[in-house]
Structures are given as structure tokens and as C-alpha cells.
Amino acid sequence: MAGHSQFKNIMHRKGRQDAVRSKMFSKLAREITVAAKAGLPDPAMNPRLRLAIQNAKAQSMPKDNIERAVKKAAGGDAETYEEVRYEGYGPAGVAVIVEALTDNRNRTASNVRSIFTKAGGALGETGSVSFSFDRVGEITYKLSVGDADTVMEAAIEAGADDVETDEEGHTITCGFEDIGEVSKALEGALGEAETVKAVWKPQNTVPVDEEKAQSLMKLIDNLEDDDDVQNVYSNFEVSEEVLAKLSA
């Protein structure tokens, strides 16, 4: 499992999700507003908005918050946000991709650069690390939808490329351009997914020890704490032994 997925599981077990719920809702609302402003405010006619709302619901975002975010775009008074991608290296030469939605590129770039520098890493040029990742679709389901074999069969039938099942749930990957078609087929077989999104998947992972893993987790934590940052991806991996220590 790639390092960032492991990191998220650790933070979930430590209860950090509750501590950052308000910030998470703010990020989800921003994506909903941007999606609604970029197309029609009707999720039935706007695939990006439909996915944004679906992902917000998966995180138990209140219905009122979702509706307010959509209306904000329809009202025409929403800030203008740009989608920006930053790429760099963290401790141990680990590649990191940061996706942001910002109304001030200079502010966000300065903040992201500062976080990388303080962690002993460096912000690079766009394209400096993304070549070592693949842009893919990721569809997740809770374990309750079925066992690994059932989900694997549905995924193959839907045209997905891979399925991983662990204690957190089922993660299905597919080609970036196939997200809509595959997720629709899976919905017919398994019901509505928990999340459907495009992600950066590392082609290879870099093993790190406990010390470096802690530094990388802190880097990712600080990046995700920035209001403008929506997603962070990395290519580090830790052993089960180190994972157990970090989860303790």
C-alpha cells in the first residue's frame, strides 16, 4: 500500500478525522462550488458536481452545507478559484504531488514552498515528479457491499483495472478516461460508491524507515492543513512493522 494511504489509515485510527472535520467540509464545499460554477448547478447534468456531492455525502457532510455550496456558485458571488498542481520532493527523496484550489496563486505557492522547505524537502517545477505517477480513476466501497471475490467480479465486468481489499474497504482503480463508465457499471452491480475520484497513483514506491515515515507524515499533515490544498499524493511505503509502531 502506498504511503499516503497508510498515513490516512493511521490518522483515521488516531481519531484525527474528527479534529479536522470542519476543515474537510470547507475543502469539500470549495470543490462543490467550483464544480457548480464550471458547469450547470444541476448534478444530473454536471458529472463533476455529481461526484463532488457524492464524495461530500460519503464524509457525512450535512445536506444544508452541500446546498449552500451549490447556491453560492449559482448566486454569482463565489470567489474565482484556479486549479493548481505543485510537485516536489520530501525527505528521503520521496515524490509528492499537491493539488489545490486557490483564489491567490502567490499565497498558495508561498505556503506550499515553505511547508516543503521546513520538512527538509523542496518544491520543484510542474512535471518534475508527476511522470512517475499514473493518473487513474479510484472508486471506493465499504466492506459491507460484499466480499473481495464479489467486488472483484463486479469490477472486472465493469472494465476496471485493479481491486484492493483491506480492513478499510474496497478500492477499485480504472483508466482515468473510464471513470464515468466504470463507476456507472459498478453502481448497477454494487450500489452507489463511497467515493469516485481521479487520483495520482505511483508507478513505484520508495521504502522508508520509521524516522523518515514520521517526517513524511508531518509534511503531508501540514500540507493538508492548508486551506487551499485539496489533495496530496506521495510514493513512499512503510513496512508492516513500522506501520504498527506508527499506529500505536
Curated annotation (Swiss-Prot):
GO terms for cellular component: cytosol. One of its GO terms (molecular function) is DNA binding. Keywords: Cytoplasm, DNA-binding, Transcription, Transcription regulation. Belongs to the TACO1 family. This is Probable transcriptional regulatory protein Smed_2641. HAMAP family: Transcrip_reg_TACO1. PANTHER family: TRANSCRIPTIONAL REGULATORY PROTEIN YEBC-RELATED (PTHR12532:SF6), TRANSLATIONAL ACTIVATOR OF CYTOCHROME C OXIDASE 1 (PTHR12532). Its main location: cytoplasm. InterPro entries: Integrase-like_N, TACO1_YebC-like_2nd/3rd_dom, TACO1_YebC_N, Transcrip_reg_TACO1-like, Transcrip_reg_TACO1-like_dom3, YebC-like. It is found in: Cytoplasm. GO terms for biological process: regulation of DNA-templated transcription.
